[in-house]
Amino acid sequence: MSPQTETKAGVGFKAGVNEYKLTYYTPEYETKDTDILAAFRVTPQPGVPPEERGEAVAAESSTGTWTTVWTDGLTSLDRYKGRCYHIEPVPGEEDQFIAYVAYPLDLFEEGSVTNMFTSIVGNVFGFKALRALRLEDLRIPVAYVKTFQGPPHGIQVERDKLNKYGRPLLGCTIKPKLGLSAKNYGRAVYECLRGGLDFTKDDENVNSQPFMRWRDRFLFCAEAIYKSQAETGEIKGHYLNATAGTCEDMMKRAVFARELGVPIVMHDYLTGGFTANTTLAHYCRDNGLLLHIHRAMHAVIDRQKNHGMHFRVLAKALRMSGGDHIHAGTVVGKLEGERDITLGFVDLLRDDYIEKDRSRGIYFTQDWVSLPGVIPVASRGIHVWHMPALTEIFGDDSVLQFGGGTLGHPWGNAPGAVANRVALEACVKARNEGRDLAAEGGEIIREACKWSP
């Protein structure tokens, strides 16, 4: 036995499974301004004390492993470990509690959402001592926020680029989402833009399939944009989906969009991945492209109430990674969305500073300092009769994204777009005149119908 090993054996430690609470449960800890704070909804296995599971979450998502190891002595665990500093019951749930965990900033790579999520949620969700685990919210400290570029441009710069103020923007997803040829697809884009929409959109799963290769789609959509701009005198755009199987192909598509001179591209940020998304966001800022973000796959992560991750966390991550728009639910329409909770993460996307407000699901005060805001997109299952509610709920800094609510008009695509635009302008005008959109919305739309298809 070497002298070094002999010395260690003489002053060694007891091997075996550790009790995490001896190290990672620290209710006396006072959080620092530089800590990343997390709120986890924990559903433990029966008979397991909350403290034991709370500290296990802190351990498994930071420096902990199931036993003491020799190399623990080569670093400072007190400096690097996560700490479960508070536990509270979930009202109305006997077997659940919220565990608050603080992580030292040195655990995370600067400017990397990928690394942040790998650390905080990458492993602990499979922990067998837990029946379920959900990340409800994160507090991102200013020191970490400042390491991110964030959205390529932000709300005000986008409005200046488009020269459109004082109202929500209007969009439409081209349908059917799959099966159209590039030429027919471009025709639908033109008809919608010519009818009065600001944007049209590739559906999230339109990439480069045999029936419509990406380059052909980009060319026909660019033609539709320029033709509609010439005829309306307004700046138009189409969300050209740059999502691809490799980052190299994604960037090739973004470069071609820039060469065509179009104003905006699109990315599926969850299926594409945060590293790809941040790369694309940096390119978009450097090259004057707006970036529309689709959240395809989000419900796999956020729909279950007890397990996964709340969308407000994904929304914060997107603001850090970069995107000028993101789909954010509707409150009305065909997708789920509670009004107060939805408006909570809408404010997290748009505002510079958001106070803690548990009634809206906001567990921590969040200061975004100089990080630009993201425009929330209301989409899926909406139509002109929803316009008063959408205008009231989302306000001006939003995109109201129709699909069947435009293309389903019995007279065709262009009349559907006209109906959308007339309804929006009627609601904005009524709101500015002091009318109550919630009470008078139906009447306002019926009045507008007299002057619209």
From Swiss-Prot:
The modification N-acetylproline is found at residue 3. Its EC number is 4.1.1.39. It holds the Pfam family RuBisCO_large_N. Binds 1 Mg(2+) ion per subunit. Mg(2+) binds at residues 201, 203-204. It is an enzyme of class 4 (lyase). Keywords: Acetylation, Calvin cycle, Carbon dioxide fixation, Chloroplast, Disulfide bond, Lyase, Magnesium, Metal-binding, Methylation, Monooxygenase, Oxidoreductase, Photorespiration, Photosynthesis, Plastid. Its main location: plastid. PROSITE patterns: RUBISCO_LARGE. The disulfide bond which can form in the large chain dimeric partners within the hexadecamer appears to be associated with oxidative stress and protein turnover. Substrate binds at residues 123, 173, 177, 295, 327, 379. Residues 1-2 form a propeptide. Its cofactor is Mg(2+). InterPro entries: RuBisCO, RuBisCo_large_chain_AS, RuBisCO_lsu_C, RuBisCO_lsu_C_sf, RuBisCO_lsu_fd_N, RuBisCO_lsu_N_sf, RuBisCO_lsuI. The modification N6,N6,N6-trimethyllysine is found at residue 14. The active site is at 175 (proton acceptor), 294 (proton acceptor). NCBIfam families: PRK04208.1. PANTHER family: RIBULOSE BISPHOSPHATE CARBOXYLASE (PTHR42704), RIBULOSE BISPHOSPHATE CARBOXYLASE LARGE CHAIN (PTHR42704:SF15). Heterohexadecamer of 8 large chains and 8 small chains; disulfide-linked. The disulfide link is formed within the large subunit homodimers. RuBisCO catalyzes two reactions: the carboxylation of D-ribulose 1,5-bisphosphate, the primary event in carbon dioxide fixation, as well as the oxidative fragmentation of the pentose substrate in the photorespiration process. Both reactions occur simultaneously and in competition at the same active site. Belongs to the RuBisCO large chain family. Type I subfamily. This is Ribulose bisphosphate carboxylase large chain. The gene is rbcL.
